[in-house]
Amino acid sequence: MENLDALVAQALEAVQRAEDITTLEQIRVQFLGKKGELTQVMKTLGNLPAEERPKVGALINDAKERVTDVLNARKAGFEEAELNARLAAECIDVTLPGRGQTTGGLHPITRTLERIEQFFTHIGYGIAEGPEVEDDYHNFEALNIPGHHPARAMHDTFYFNANMLLRTHTSPVQVRTMESSQPPIRIVCPGRVYRCDSDITHSPMFHQVEGLLIDRGINFADLKGTIEEFLRVFFEKELAVRFRPSFFPFTEPSAEVDIQCVMCSGKGCRVCKQTGWLEVMGCGMVHPNVLRMSGIDPEEFQGFAFGMGAERLAMLRYGVNDLRLFFDNDLRFLAQFR
């Protein structure tokens, strides 16, 4: 048993000298593993007389338990020290400023659409929507643009087949509203429209807002007053406005609306091509043929319509010189409009 006591003393001394958990594991294998020194002592019991085996076996088991307990205690100490060191390294100073959250913002086109809708709903207009995949009748025929009409050349249209297409304006929403509702009608129709055109001032997909008012006794003065007030509120400036005679198949008389250049205050600059004026929208009195085709008697009811591009107004309001910037998804650009 002197040999057993020496092995235990040797094991305990090795445990005390160990500096990490890896060394402790090596000591465990050395003394308690399958081929460990204390395990080998246990295997010598077979050489002892039968009456001595229980006593010696108990001594060996006691020795193994002592070594195991000291090993486990030492290992627990290392684990606690390691945990404390990690906690100290990962300690959070609660007095430091928190990590700020980067807040998003509405897209400038969305802001522009909301601004337009807010004005018109405030004066009693409703919001109307319709399908973006439209039929030829509602996109052209019902708007006084028959198949042979030269005005169709004004629209570079995306066709699916001879009858179905991507709408080129939101005017079909007005037609569908007139077909399903009785006057008085006061609506604005915001939405995406599609034309085969792409350059610095055009996109194959863009946003348009068209308005329609149908009632008794409506005249061009009502249209003029509505548009002038809208432009004043939208740009938050007292801008000069002019109406130039123009042509649209679905309105008569028709006009283009110009405003005094917001960049140079009418003095003339590169943006307005030295004219002092910027075109912002088209308008006119609803053509009698359009009213008739929608089931409304033009002898009893009159109306006006107008249409504007949201991107065009956004470019003027925010001073953007390239329409494509709105759709490039560049956060450096979009973050300016929070």
UniProtKB/Swiss-Prot annotation:
Would you kindly state one Gene Ontology biological process term found in this protein's UniProt entry?
phenylalanyl-tRNA aminoacylation
Keyword line: Aminoacyl-tRNA synthetase, ATP-binding, Cytoplasm, Ligase, Magnesium, Metal-binding, Nucleotide-binding, Protein biosynthesis
Report which superkingdom the organism of origin falls in.
Bacteria
Primary localisation category = cytoplasm
Which cofactors must be present for this protein to function? Mg(2+)
Protein name, as recorded: Phenylalanine--tRNA ligase alpha subunit
Organism from which the protein derives: Pseudomonas entomophila (strain L48)
Listed under catalytic activity are:
tRNA(Phe) + L-phenylalanine + ATP = L-phenylalanyl-tRNA(Phe) + AMP + diphosphate + H(+)
The record ties this protein, via CDD domains, to: PheRS_alpha_core (cd00496)
Oligomeric state and partners?
A: Tetramer of two alpha and two beta subunits.
What does the cofactor field's note say? Binds 2 magnesium ions per tetramer.
NCBIfam families given in the database record: pheS
Location comes to:
Cytoplasm
Similarity field:
Belongs to the class-II aminoacyl-tRNA synthetase family. Phe-tRNA synthetase alpha subunit type 1 subfamily.
The record's top EC class is ligase
What GO cellular component is one of the record's annotations? cytoplasm
EC number(s) given by UniProt: 6.1.1.20
Q: Nucleotidyltransferase among the record's keywords?
A: no
PROSITE patterns documented for this protein: AA_TRNA_LIGASE_II (PS50862)
